[in-house]
Amino acid sequence: MKPNAVKAFSLAVVLLAGPICSRAVTILSGPSFTRATNAPLAGVLQLATDVETRVSVSVSDGTNVWQRRFYDYATTHSVPLLGFKPNRTNEITVTVYDRYQNPVTAAQPLVFITNPLPSNFPNIVLLQSQPDRMEPGYTLFNVMMKNSTYWYVAIVDSSGEVVWYNGAPSTADVRRLDNGDLFMPWTTNFVEMNLLGQIVNSWVVPTNLPINLHDGVPTSHGTILYLSDAVMVVSNYPTSMTNPVAPRATAKVRYQNVVEISATNAAVLHTWTPINFLDPLRISYLIVNSLGSWDSEHSNAVIEDPSDDSLIVSMCMQNAVIKFSRATGQLRWILGPPANWGPAWQPYLLTPVGTPFVWQYGQHAPILTPQGTLILFDNGNYRASPFAPILSVTNYYSRAVEYSINEKTMQVSQVWDYGTTNAAQRLYVDHEGNAEPEPLTGNVLTDFAAVSYVNGVAPSSFGPTATMTRITEVTHDALPQIVFDLAISLYANTNTSYKDCETYRSHRIPDLYAHPAQPVADLSVTLEYGPPFLQFSADDTRTYVIQASTNLVDWEAIGAALEDEQQSGDFSFADVGAEALPVRYYRVLTQ
C-alpha cells in the first residue's frame, strides 16, 4: 500500500581474472500457458529449468510482435503474461537465460487464442493519438453501461485497443497500486485485485461506517481514506432551491463523514465530520431530495495535503472544495462561489484574483500538483448559485481547471483550463469525471465521464440521457493541443436497448507490470580485453549506478551503466580507471 520509493539495492562482486564459462541450460518441464479465469486477456506461463534462469517471451499475434523480459532468477517459474489483445491468435516463444546469459529457447511456441470482446462491451473509437507526445503507458478506466447495471474495468493502449478487461463488481473508481494491482471500493469493503483477476486483499469496514463508492484512497503511510454517508435532522431547512421565500421546515440532510482505516487490519483510526464546521442549511441548485433526505454535500473525493497535514474534500452539491486540519478539524479554506455562505464562513472563503477566472460548479476529483496548485474536473452544473438566473443547459460546458491558492492572503487565481473556448468541442458532463496531471510530460488526461451535450446538442439521436465518454489528453499550454482522444459509447451496439455509457474516472498507468527497484542478480566482471568490464541484465525502466571500492568499506560512484542499443535490459560498464589498482570491488545501486 506504500508508494514505490526509489531504493538502493546493491550487490558486491570481486574482480574476476578471466572469461566465464557454463554448461547448457535444460528446460525440465513446460513451458505451458493457462488462461486467467477472470481476466480473459491474461494468463500464466509456467516452466522449470535445471539451473536458476530468467524468462523472456516474444509474442506474435498476427499483426504485431512484442517482447517481455523478466529478471527474477529461479528454477521454477510462474509468470503472469499481460497485454494480449482480443480476437487474436498469439504465438508465444519462450527463452530462458542462466546467470551467464546463456540462452535456451523452447522447441515449440505456445499458442493462446483470445476471444472477441463480449457482445455488450462498449464501442471504443480512437479519434486521435500522437504517442510521441503522449504520457507513456496505458489508460485505465471503469466503464458503466445500461443505467449502471453492468460495467467493465478496462485498460487500453495508445491506439485505443483493449489489452485487459474484467467484469469487476465496482461502479466507481479503480486505481493502480504501486505493486501493479488494482484497488477499488465495494459497498462493504475495499479490494485489491491483481491483473489475473484474482482478489488478493480485502478490507472490510464497520457496518456503521459504510463505504460511499465515490472514493477510496490508499495513503503513503499505510492507511485508507474514504467517505461514508450519514444523515442528520436539521430545523429551518429551505424547502426550495429556486424560491427564496418558500417556507422552511425540519428536514433530514445527508452528508459524508471522512474515515481513515488501517491498511493492515482495517481498524478505524480517525473519523471527521465536515458538516459540523460547515453550514448544513446552505443550498445550491444541485441539491435534491432523494432516498428520504436532502443530498446536501454529495462529497466525491478526499485527498491529503502532506505540506501541512490536512485533508481536502470535494463536495459537488455545495460547489465547494474545502480544506481542514487532520489533527484538529479546523477549517482552513473554502474554494467555490461565495453565494449563500453566512457570516461565520466569510473568513474561510477564497477571493479570486486575476483574469480569466471562473468558479467551478459540481466539481470532482481535486489533485494537488507537484507545483502546489490544485487541478480538478469542473462539471459546470448550472454555472450559478441560488437565487441567480441559470443558463440554458445547452450553454453549459465542463472543463479541467487548475487553481493556485495563496493561503496567506486567502486568494485564488486560475492558472490553466481546458474545455472552454480553447477546446475544439464544448462538452458538458453533469456528473463524474476527473483531470489528471501526468508526471513525465506535464500533459493533462481529462475524463469527460458522461457527456450529455456536445456544442449544446445531444451526442446522438438517442438524446442527452444516452451519455458517452470522451477521454482526452492535452498539453499543458495556454492553447492546449490534443494528443489523445478516445470516444466510448453504446450507440452502435445492437445488443442492448440502453445507450448510456460513462466512466467514473480515467488514469494513465505507466505499464501493465510493476517495476520495483530490485537488486541486480547476475552481475559479472571480466578482464579478458582491456579494463574491467561489468555486465548484467535488469529492468530497463530503472537506472543503475556503478560504485567501486578497494576495501569493501569506502564506496565511490564511478558512473552509470549503459543499456545495449540492440537488446533492451542488457547493461554494461567499462571501468577505465581501475587498471593501476591491485584489487577492485563493485556494486550496483538500482534507482
Model-derived regions, located:
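Histidine-/acidic-rich catalytic cores in large beta-rich domains
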Residues: 25-46, 50-55, 59, 78, ...
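Short, flexible loop/turn segments at beta-strand junctions in immunoglobulin-like
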Residues: 81-86, 575-579
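Short S/T/G- and acidic-enriched coil/turn segments that sit immediately N-terminal to beta-strands
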Residues: 75-80, 571-573
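Bacterial N-terminal signal peptides
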Residues: 8-19
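Surface-exposed loop/edge segments in extracytoplasmic proteins
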Residues: 62-70, 163-164, 200, 553-560
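Short beta-strand segments enriched for Tyr within beta-sheet-rich domains
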Residues: 84, 88-96, 544, 584-586
